[in-house]
Curated annotation (Swiss-Prot):
SUPFAM superfamilies: HAD-like (SSF56784). It is an enzyme of class 3 (hydrolase). This is Putative HAD-hydrolase YfnB. Belongs to the HAD-like hydrolase superfamily. YjjG family. The active site is at 10 (nucleophile). Gene3D superfamilies: HAD superfamily/HAD-like, Putative phosphatase, domain 2. It comes from the Bacteria. InterPro entries: HAD-like_sf, HAD-SF_hydro_IA, HAD-SF_hydro_IA_YjjG/PynA, HAD_sf, PGP-like_dom2, Pyrimidine_5'-ntase_YjjG. Keywords: Hydrolase. It comes from Bacillus subtilis (strain 168). Its EC number is 3.-.-.-. GO terms for biological process: pyrimidine ribonucleotide catabolic process.
């Protein structure tokens, strides 16, 4: 079995539960605005938000364009006029409080950092990601954190990964594994950068033929087998 030395972890829905953080932040934002948040609006927000972030991954939009237009675009569909940038500021404050861990994340990361060099690779807003990682207790386990906002590039762009590789001492692509939940950002990005990839896929989403991960897992504990190490927590 291949021996890895460096592990690159995505954040949202890989080690931190972004779905829970997002749901809470949306509820608090709409309560603040005195606007009823319906299930239809939640679903439409996800559609709009995912589409905008996909455009960001493809280099078609900036991060500021994504976050400052998503709420105004959503509310316009329901007859509301809104200041998208102002709503984003309020939403961001609520979102930063969401640091619920994915099941098994703390034990896994605290174990792995004893044997591997761990790094964060994430698309998003720097202040938000740093705060959530600190509040979750995971921050000290990582040697460095690479947020797209700080690098000037984003996953899956090769320039993003080049930026990361240049800042990892004695970096070796052959001995590096990236773990993430996004086929387009993490898995495709890892492949373009010459890395082995591990797709975190708890919901058993269908794959696409052109993006085949090296490994696929349903829960984080499965990484112990891939990395050929003992799960000291369960023993």
């Amino acid at each position: 079995m291949k021996r890895y030395r460096t592990l690159l972890f995505d954040v949202d829905d890989t080690i931190l539960d972004f779905q829970a953080a997002e749901a809470l932040a949306l509820r608090l934002l709409f309560e603040d605005q005195n606007i009823p948040l319906t299930n239809d609006m939640k679903a439409q927000y996800k559609t709009i938000n995912q589409g905008l972030w996909r455009a960001f991954e493809e280099g078609k939009m900036t991060r500021d364009e994504v976050v400052n237009t998503r709420f105004s675009a959503l509310l316009k569909e329901y007859g509301y006029e809104a200041d998208g940038a102002l709503l984003e500021q309020k939403y961001r404050r609520f979102l930063e409080e969401g640091h619920q861990l994915i099941d098994g994340a703390f034990d896994l990361i605290s174990n792995l950092q004893q044997q591997f060099d761990l790094y964060i690779v994430t698309n998003g807003v720097s202040h938000t990601q740093y705060k959530r990682l600190r509040d979750s207790g995971l921050f000290p386990f990582f040697k460095d954190i690479f947020v797209s906002e700080d690098t000037g590039f984003q996953k899956p762009m090769k320039e993003y990964f080049n930026y990361v590789f240049e800042r990892i001492p004695q970096f070796s692509a052959e001995h590096t594994l990236i773990i993430g939940d996004s086929l387009t950002a993490d898995i495709k990005g890892g492949q373009l950068a010459g890395l082995d990839t591990c797709w975190m896929n708890p919901d058993m989403k269908p794959n696409v033929p052109e993006i085949i991960p090296t490994y696929e897992i349903r829960k984080l504990e499965e990484l112990y087998h891939i990395l050929n190490i003992e799960n000291t927590v369960s023993c």
